[in-house]
From Swiss-Prot:
Function: Removes the 2'-phosphate from RNA via an intermediate in which the phosphate is ADP-ribosylated by NAD followed by a presumed transesterification to release the RNA and generate ADP-ribose 1''-2''-cyclic phosphate (APPR>P). May function as an ADP-ribosylase.
Gene Ontology annotations of biological process type: tRNA processing; tRNA splicing, via endonucleolytic cleavage and ligation
Keywords of the record: NAD, Transferase
Disulfide-linked positions: none
Gene Ontology MF term list: NAD+ poly-ADP-ribosyltransferase activity; tRNA 2'-phosphotransferase activity
UniProt record similarity statement: Belongs to the KptA/TPT1 family.
Annotated source species: Streptomyces coelicolor (strain ATCC BAA-471 / A3(2) / M145)
UniProt-listed Enzyme Commission number(s): 2.7.1.-
Pfam families: PTS_2-RNA (PF01885)
UniProt name for this protein: Probable RNA 2'-phosphotransferase
Length: 182
């Protein structure tokens, strides 16, 4: 499968499993799962046909493991704007997690901390390298270390998704380390 096609199918899956399943007539269960055959049929009926083999390739080769397959069902691993209960267990985070952003967002983050925005949770990376890649999608990256151990000790709840993304509802700014102003 060509890389360009892989990216297109992956983006289509993300859009319709995370955000807009109803646009192609899908109704995920409370955990975000849909039947694979129904997804493939709905995509074809709405002008974006792909095969089960293409879907399997996208799931198997996605470096961020954005999708989970269980038997005959598929869901996005995290990042939903629709209501889902991923049933992720509570987890004890490492001492530090990281958030990738860009400089233009720092003022708002200083004032409000990290908020989920249009998602259900704030997404945190386990290492600086991943956070740098995340921030780079929107410009020159700025990586903010998160004092996850203190947050956890103070009662904040963390979950970790199947693809290693750490999730929490909010990160108050007092747990963030900001870069020195220039």
């Amino acid at each position: 499968m060509q890389q360009e096609r892989t990216v297109k199918v992956s983006k289509y899956l993300s859009k319709h499993l995370r955000h807009q399943p109803e646009r192609i007539g899908l109704t995920p269960d409370e955990g975000g799962w849909v039947e694979i055959d129904a997804l493939v049929a709905a995509a074809a009926a709405h002008g974006f046909p792909f095969t089960r083999q293409e879907l399997d390739h996208v799931v198997a080769t996605n470096d961020k493991r954005r999708f989970a397959v269980e038997g005959t069902r598929i869901r996005a691993s995290q990042g939903h704007s629709i209501a889902v209960d991923l049933r992720l267990p509570v987890a004890t985070p490492p001492p530090y997690l990281y958030h990738g952003t860009v400089a233009r967002h720092l003022e708002a983050i200083r004032a409000e901390g990290l908020r989920p925005m249009n998602r259900h949770d704030v997404h945190l990376s386990p290492d600086r390298e991943t956070a740098t890649r995340v921030g780079a999608r929107r410009g020159r990256p700025v990586v903010l270390p998160v004092d996850a151990a203190t947050m956890h000790r103070d009662g904040h709840v963390f979950h970790v998704s199947a693809n290693g993304v750490w999730l929490t509802q909010h990160v108050p700014s007092r747990y963030l380390r900001f870069p020195a102003p220039h």
